């Protein structure tokens, strides 16, 4: 995703990323005021400067759609995780990490992988789903842009 962001930025696009964490993440740096405030019971904190802000809010659930509303000026919003969402997906399948696609085939746009040809053939995915080399961010970026801006 970081390489894709560099490519999109070079093309003049403003891109946001929403990441789903299946675990409970630590949203701040230990020792900061806002970290201590959260640890002391604040249900939310915000820190900001002239050029950016960070908002942390204890909330049981928020949808990717609600999160996307924080970025109305974005040209493109990438989602990481969210394997069960209704948005189109490029699934990453890494050798030694996953052996099958877990995404809804109707939402699967492509697969980015480091599997060899024989291992790819063994995957049970739709025939019309394109494969990309995992490290070929330029081709993946062009695929995203051609689909998104058509």
What are the residue ranges of the model-derived segments?
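N-terminal phosphate/diphosphate-binding loop that engages ATP/GTP or pyrophosphate donors
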Residues: 2-58
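Short coil/turn connectors at secondary-structure junctions
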Residues: 11-14, 42-43, 72-74, 87, ...
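Phosphate-binding/switch loop-helix module in NTP-utilizing enzymes
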Residues: 56-84
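Conserved active-site and cofactor/substrate-binding residues in soluble primary-metabolism enzymes
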Residues: 3, 32, 62, 135, ...
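Phosphate/Mg2+-binding loops and adjacent switch elements
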Residues: 76-133, 137-149
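Charged helix-capping and loop-helix junction motifs
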Residues: 31, 61-65, 96-97
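Solvent-exposed alpha-helices and their adjacent loops that cap or buttress functional pockets
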Residues: 38-39, 47, 69-71, 101-104
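P-loop NTP-binding site
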Residues: 8, 70, 147-150
């Amino acid at each position: 995703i970081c390489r894709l962001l560099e490519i999109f930025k070079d093309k003049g696009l403003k891109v946001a990323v929403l990441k789903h964490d299946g675990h409970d993440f630590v949203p701040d740096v230990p020792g900061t005021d806002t970290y201590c405030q959260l640890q002391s019971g604040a249900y939310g904190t915000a820190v900001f400067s002239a050029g950016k802000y960070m908002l942390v809010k204890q909330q049981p659930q928020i949808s990717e759609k609600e999160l996307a509303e924080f970025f109305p000026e974005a040209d493109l919003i990438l989602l990481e995780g969210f394997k069960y969402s209704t948005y189109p997906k490029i699934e990453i399948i890494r050798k030694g990490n996953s052996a099958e696609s877990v995404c809804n085939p109707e939402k699967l746009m492509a697969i980015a992988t480091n599997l060899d040809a024989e291992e790819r053939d063994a995957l049970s995915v739709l025939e019309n789903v394109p494969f990309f080399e995992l490290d070929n961010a330029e081709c993946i970026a062009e695929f995203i842009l051609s689909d998104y801006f058509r």
